[in-house]
Amino acid sequence: MIDCGRKFIPMSYLQDLVKIMAYYKMNTLQVHLNDNGFKQYFDNNWDKTYAAFRLESETYPGLTARDGSYSKKEFIDFQKQAATNFVEIIPEIDIPAHSLAFTHYKPEIGSKEYGMDHLDLFKPETYQFADNLFKEYLKGDDPVFVGKRVHIGTDEYSNAKKEVVEKFRAFTDHYIRLVEGFGKQAVIWGALTHAKGDTPVKSENIIMNAWYNGYADPATMIKDGYQLISIPDAMVYIVPLAGYYQDYLNEVFLYKEWTPAHIGKAVFEEKHPAILGGMFAIWNDHAGNGMSVKDIHHRVFPALQTLAVKTWTGKETSLPFEVYNEKRSAISEAPGVNQLGRIGKSPALVYERSTVAPGSTSTYPEIGYNYTVSFDITGAPEKSGTELFRSPNAVFYLADPIRGMMGFARDGYLNTFPYKVNPGEKATIQIEGDHRSTTLRVNGKVVEEMNIQKCYFNAGKDSMSYIRTLVFPLEKAGNFNSRIENLKVHNYRVSK
């Protein structure tokens, strides 16, 4: 499952991810289409809190996020192309919590009691809005939601009062039946232990993400007739830099100990007929924390490799982890896919040019972690926004657009070093990057090592980790005036 709500994930990456999944025989990708940040990072103001819905909507013009979205056509094409690779896309519209994108658009359907990220379950307008939204993507001979399953959310709504619990259960049942009315199988997040009540919720032929046993006790859910996807949060949730979940999955533990039959502390027989399989998730909880799609992939890819082994083999792994870990390093992401930006398999100087002419192109689009890029520069007057190199994913500036300093931009984030080359000045520049930092050296001295930065909110009560990494762009040189010589690219950090 990939959270595209809190951070926009470009379609090009989703397409590559499907290719990787197919290569490793993973068959289901749940695409989480809406979500929101946490209001404590936005002045404790719901109106300022980041929220997004990523799909084009003609029913509700203006609902779709302006900082990245998918047209109906490209989402349809994506699902159909994935199906040719035997990967099913399960689109998710998450209601009635995690719904700030919808209440930003239509504030009157937000809950004043439980927060504006909750829909008000007691207002008829809420149902009218959500009914029409789902119908937009379900109706017609060629619906936007192509596959046989649709996820309706139902995650983490308040259970503060019995009457709201019963309303939540009725709401869940309503949207199960709505998507079924269009011939789809409904998928829900496990919440019915947390929302324990009397109102019946359909269980026959319903799939439930079993993520936390306090929200949905898996033994009870199986007894009630639900089919489960094993996705235990403490084991298989990636929440980058958050601190309360894993930043990278504990693959040694997963490889040696976990199977889909392990849902939290509950252990079932292997290949239990009610457990359809396993899944892992990447949640982008901390909207605005500097994460790039490349950083997300750096976490996703090794997890995908290991979960592919475990979901297919269970306990019957054929190699010790140490042997598996060594051998997988030689395997590509997928034919024609290099999201990690790997160049070469052994530590080496992998690319060099005696001079870099403005506008020239490179053999490689980019180099990923770990790397060192160095060059000699003779400075000349440069306009703000002058690029050294760019790729489809990033830009490295000789003079950034704001302050005219050396720096880089990717995924909507601009990071600048406290340095610029003055006209007539000669210097040797070295940039090193790994999955946690980007370092600039000038003439052998560190100017700045951009490590993970702690940002504080609400008088220090709340904090967020901010990352400043860069998969270095190499594809095309900018239109600079300075002279660039002796470009060298190493696929390791030469200072380490």
Where are these regions (language model features)?
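Feature activates predominantly on carbohydrate-active enzymes
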Residues: 1-118, 125, 131-149, 284
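Active-site beta-loop-alpha junctions enriched in small/polar residues
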Residues: 5, 34-38, 94-98, 155-157, ...
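Flexible, acidic glycine-rich loops studded with aromatic residues
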Residues: 20, 199-206, 213-354
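Beta-rich nucleic-acid/ligand-interaction surfaces
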Residues: 36-52, 194-201, 448, 454-457
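Active-site neighborhood of glycoside hydrolase catalytic domains
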Residues: 102-207, 211-227
